[in-house]
Amino acid sequence: VSRDIRVGLYGSGRTAGELVAALKKTGYRLTAAVVHSPRRAGQDIGVLTGGDRIGLATVSDLARAVRSGRFDVLLYAGLAGERHQEAMALCAAAGVHMVHACFVHPLIAVDEELRGRLSELAMSSGSRIVGTGMIPGLWLDVLPALLASALPAPVRIRGRRASDISSWGSDVLVHELGVGSRLAGTATRIDLLLRESAHIIADALRLAGDRVESRGGLAMASSDTVVGGVEVRAGEVEGFDQEVVVYENGAERIRLTWSGFAARTARGTAQGSDGGVELQLLGADQSEIAVHVAAPLDPYPGTAARMVSAIGGLPALPPGLHPTTALPVG
C-alpha cells in the first residue's frame, strides 16, 4: 500500500477510534485529525478516541484543515446532516477525496440542488466522494445484488437485519434515531437508509420500480429501560422496526426489513437482535438462494474496515459523487 496517500480524519467517536486503529495496520499516513468541539482541540487523537498516544493533535477548524493541503483523503466519521454536507462541499472545492459512512447512494440521499453543486465542484477540482459501510453498504444491498446475478431474472429479493443498538453511541441513538423522545411514526433515518439499499439492488436488477412503500417505524418502550446509556421511559422511543418494499408492475420485487433494539430489553430479546442477516432470493424458475449471516454484533470495526478499504478504490473512479457499488469488490 502506498505511503504517499495522506489521510485526514473527522470525528472523535467510536468509528473514529476504529479508523485510527485500522490505519495503523496499513501503509496510509494519518496526517490530520479534526474534531467538532473546540474543547477537544489540541488533544492527541489516539488518546481522545480511547487508544494509545500517536503524536497527532486534533484541530477544530474543518475548513482550514481541508484547505491546508495536509491530506489527500478525508475519512469522515461524524454524523449525517449539515456538518457532513459542509465537509463534502469543502472537500469537493479543495480537490480532497472523501470516504464517509453517512449514505451509499447519492441519488437517494442528496437533494438534486446540492448534488448538482457538489458534482460540479468535484469534477472541477478532481475530488471523489463515496460512501460505504455495513448497513447500508453491504448486508442488505451489495451482498444480495451480487447473489442475484446467479439466478435467472426476474429475481425477487427479501432481506432482514436484526441489530443490537446498545453499542451505537448516544449521539446516534438520540440525534439520528430519536431514542428517548416522544417521536412517532416512520423511523426517518432508517427508512432513508433502506431506500438507498433498495435503490442499489434495483440498479443491479435493472428495475424501474413503479412503487415504493414504507412500513413500520419507531417502537415505543412499554416500561422504563436503558438503551445504550440513554434512559428511556415508558412511551418513549426505544428502537425501530422499519421496512421498505419495492413493486414493479404490481408485483413485489424487493422487501428489506431492519429492526434495532437493545438486546437486553424485552423487545430485543423477542426479536433476536443478535446481529443476524437473513437473505432470500428467488429466481424466475423458482430456484432459491437462502443465506444466514452471523454478522458481528459490533458494527463499528467493520464500518471502519470498509472505509479504509475504499481508499484504495478511489483512483479508479472519475471525479464526482459515487454510490458504494462504484468501488471495486475487496
Question: Where are the language model's segments positioned?
Answer:
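Short, ordered loop/turn segments at secondary-structure junctions
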Residues: 36-38, 79, 103-106, 134-135, ...
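Conserved N-terminal Rossmann-fold NAD(P) cofactor-binding segment
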Residues: 37-69
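Active-site-lining helix/loop region of Rossmann-like oxidoreductase modules
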Residues: 6, 10, 148-268, 275-277, ...
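N-terminal Rossmann-like dinucleotide-binding module
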Residues: 1-49
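C-terminal helical cap and adjacent loop that interface with cofactors, partners, or active-site loops
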Residues: 266-330
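Alpha-helical support elements that line or immediately flank enzyme active sites
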Residues: 132, 138-151
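Rossmann-fold NAD(P) dinucleotide-binding segment
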Residues: 64-73, 81-103
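Rossmann-fold NAD(P)-binding glycine/threonine-rich loop
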Residues: 103-127
